[in-house]
């Protein structure tokens, strides 16, 4: 599947140009949000926020929602949250198409493990293992990896391929 190759390439090659531990503001984040909204994801900002998360992607079947909670100011963490939650939407589309469990990463496990071990800061790995059930570790590691290594434009391309059919 072309998407798997693109995800692996995005994760592995982008790390050479982006400092993985650095959240960043991207001009194309708004375009990514529009793409998601235009393709069936109900995106809400600062609604039903309780202070326990920056964002969440939820779905029932193909009824999809992304809730973002940037608060009064939008910063690099909020841009990273959009990329992260968009990756979860890609995982959802791919798993529906493949008929695999919703907590299955898009990348094959060997590629994901190699990328996580070489590119995710240990603090992120520890955060995921501390805050998520073990059966969600792989999808959260993948979302964190791409949040840090892929641009909003690259994630938009992956979303288009996985969820729109482009």
Annotate each predicted stretch with a short phrase:
Residues 35-67:
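N-terminal targeting signals for Sec/Tat export/insertion, comprising classic cleavable signal peptides
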Residues 24-25, 29-44, 102-166:
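Metalloprotease/metallohydrolase-associated module, dominated by Zn2+-dependent proteases
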Residues 66-82:
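Short pre-active-site segment immediately N-terminal to the catalytic Zn-binding motif
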Residues 18-23:
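Sec/Tat signal peptide C-region and signal peptidase I cleavage site
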Residues 86-103:
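Catalytic Zn2+-binding segment of zinc metalloproteases
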Residues 48-50, 68-70, 92-94, 162-166:
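Sequence contexts marking disulfide-bonded cysteines in secreted/extracellular proteins
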Residues 8-17:
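Bacterial N-terminal signal peptides
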Residues 1-8:
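Bacterial N-terminal signal peptides that target proteins for export
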